[in-house]
């Protein structure tokens, strides 16, 4: 099984940035359904990021660098989260081999949270 600590640090950084963006939009929105959906997202994504990091570090050692990422250009929150999801999906197999199912399953939880949040943002009012 192989892993790339730099890529895992970046994947975790994307989750951290997604939380920050969602929290800020949660405080700005005038839509109750968006407010609730984003609250759930920012509460849960940080727990998932923590679980991924701890499992990864249990297998491969400490991630020395989780970079601070710049915020993406201003866009509707569903588009921003969709783009952040695409980054997670792009990084996941560079960060840890697909055969490392315990860690990949935790990443699946993050992906599912993004998808559920996108559904709520786009379809519930």
Feature annotation, model-predicted:
Residues 9, 13-16, 20, 39, ...:
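Generic structural signal for well-ordered, non-transmembrane alpha-helical segments
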Residues 17-40, 95-100:
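Helix-loop segments that flank and shape redox-cofactor active sites
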Residues 2-13, 32-39, 71-78, 101, ...:
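Short, solvent-exposed segments of well-ordered alpha helices
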Residues 1, 124-125:
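Short intrinsically disordered terminal tails
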Residues 30, 67-68:
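Short interaction-hotspot residues at assembly and binding interfaces
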Residues 35-64:
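Conserved alpha-helical segments that form or flank metal/cofactor-binding pockets of metalloenzymes
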Residues 68-122:
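Acidic/histidine-rich alpha-helical segments that form the ligand environment
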